């Protein structure tokens, strides 16, 4: 009897394994990509954006130079997106990792919808991380406007029971499109670290991210569009219609009313006492920067490669630029997990006498504890190496502070940028962690501009002097956090600030888990 029971259990286990492997093979074969040819790109020369800013573009030092200007503070970055959509006459291409179902997301979608009403061709490419339970209204939206297309990158197919599919298709379903870009009429592009959501624009949200965005115009915009089309036509994106059913009339009407009501409520708030970048550039009140800009990005096929043999074009490009540092490297990284390989790169720079400064999140400002736990294992080695290490304080939301490029009342760092020798600049979606290097697809822009790099570098140094803990090795080589105070003095913490005793016990246990390669 016992032998029979064991045989039955063994048969059940083998059957389950065979079913699991069979389902995995079937799904992955079904989802094998079938790329389309990329179309030729064109510029909407009848666009007001082209007519109004041609003179500024014509002032570039060479045809290879692009115009650029940083977007700050937080709400201005959302307002510029809205006003760009308002002026569109030809095309809008938007690519985001997250497009939240909140006020900022509603405002953004309403701006796109208004453009679609005018006949603008809209293409919205979003990752599946933020689509679940909204497929129905998005399907109705594109049904209402044939010139509004939505595609979803690397979608799950079992929409209501994602966890079993996640297990079957791991690690592919854990690999996401982290790219972020927004292009209007082929004239202007915005790229940087921001997704679309309240926390990225300080809009009715207790959590506010400090981040970078830059507005670009010129030849680099065509590179951004090529990146967009590479993903759009990769065969790894699915039309929104294939992922669900259209919402009924009542539900769709309620949703559309929510979009328009939110837009009408918040637009006056966004515009109050704010001078937009584009009109200010046109009037000559602010001066644009010019640089030869290189747009870099991972192939969408990266999600098909083995995580143990990653093919990351972004990692190679980023490492190549960092490796050119001769005097100074400044890194702003929301999630900083350098890995053994990254530590070797930084050690090589320090051996050459390069000053390295890193700004990342503290425990109190980090929104992912397991990431902080992994990062915490690198702090002492970095300090021993001579790296200047700063951790952002989680800011008092009601403090009265001056605005800076990173924002004044931010509770968490989300920026992904670095600056080499106060001359070379990188901005994009790439975090200094294994998830960006191995798992997700990423994009960014690299350019040289000494004046801009010096300005931003100095702003960041001024920012950390008042808004971040400076880490030191104190007595017995123990970590200390120097907290800047308003009177210019420092308070020294010998224990990690804003952490309970329970959390202090948990942190090394979490750090011990073998999950760094997933973070």
Segment roles from a protein language model:
Residues 2-175, 184-519:
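Charged, low-complexity intrinsically disordered terminal segments
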């Amino acid at each position: 009897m016992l032998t029979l029971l064991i045989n039955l259990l063994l048969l059940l286990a083998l059957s389950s394994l065979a079913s699991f492997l069979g389902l995995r093979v079937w799904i992955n074969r079904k989802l094998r990509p079938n790329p389309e040819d990329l179309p030729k790109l064109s510029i909407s020369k009848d666009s007001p954006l082209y007519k109004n800013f041609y003179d500024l573009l014509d002032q570039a030092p060479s045809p290879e130079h692009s115009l650029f200007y940083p977007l700050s503070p937080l709400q201005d970055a959302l307002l510029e997106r809205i006003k760009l959509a308002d002026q569109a006459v030809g095309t809008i291409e938007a690519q985001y990792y997250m497009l939240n179902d909140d006020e900022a997301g509603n405002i953004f979608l309403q701006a796109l919808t208004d453009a679609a009403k005018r006949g603008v061709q809209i293409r919205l490419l979003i990752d599946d991380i933020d689509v679940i339970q909204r497929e129905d209204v998005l399907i109705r939206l594109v049904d209402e406007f044939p010139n509004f297309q939505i595609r979803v990158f690397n979608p799950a197919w079992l929409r209501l029971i994602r966890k079993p599919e996640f297990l079957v298709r791991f690690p592919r379903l854990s690999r996401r499109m982290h790219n972020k870009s927004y292009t209007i009429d082929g004239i202007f592009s915005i790229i940087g670290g921001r997704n679309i959501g309240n926390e990225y624009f300080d809009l009715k949200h207790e959590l506010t991210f400090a981040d970078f965005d830059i507005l670009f115009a010129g030849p680099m915009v065509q590179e951004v569009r090529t990146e967009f089309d590479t993903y759009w036509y990769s065969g790894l994106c699915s039309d929104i219609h294939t992922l669900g059913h259209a919402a009924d009339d009542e539900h769709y009407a309620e949703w559309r009313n929510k979009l328009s009501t939110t837009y009408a409520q918040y637009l006056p708030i966004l515009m109050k006492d704010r001078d937009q970048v584009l009109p200010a550039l046109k009037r000559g009140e602010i001066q644009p920067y010019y640089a030869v800009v290189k747009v870099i990005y991972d192939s969408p096929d990266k999600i098909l490669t083995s995580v143990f043999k990653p093919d990351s074009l972004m990692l190679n490009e980023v490492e190549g630029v960092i490796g050119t540092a001769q005097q100074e490297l400044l890194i702003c990284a929301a999630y900083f997990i350098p890995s053994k390989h990254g530590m070797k790169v930084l050690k090589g720079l320090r051996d050459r006498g390069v000053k390295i400064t890193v700004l990342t999140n503290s425990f109190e400002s980090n929104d992912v504890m397991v990431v902080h736990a992994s990062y915490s294992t690198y702090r002492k080695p970095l300090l021993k190496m001579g790296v200047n290490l700063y951790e952002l304080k989680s800011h008092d939301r009601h403090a009265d502070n001056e605005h800076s490029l990173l924002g004044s009342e931010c509770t968490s760092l989300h920026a992904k940028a670095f600056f080499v020798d106060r001359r070379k600049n990188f901005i994009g979606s790439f975090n200094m962690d294994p998830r960006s290097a191995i798992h997700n697809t990423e994009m960014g822009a690299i350019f040289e501009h000494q004046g801009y790099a010096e300005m931003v570098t100095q702003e960041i140094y001024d920012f950390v002097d008042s808004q971040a803990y400076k880490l030191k090795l104190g007595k017995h080589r123990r970590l200390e956090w120097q907290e800047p105070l308003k009177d210019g003095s420092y308070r020294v913490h010998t224990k990690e600030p804003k952490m309970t005793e329970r959390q202090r016990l948990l942190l090394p246990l979490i750090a011990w888990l073998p999950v760094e390669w997933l973070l």
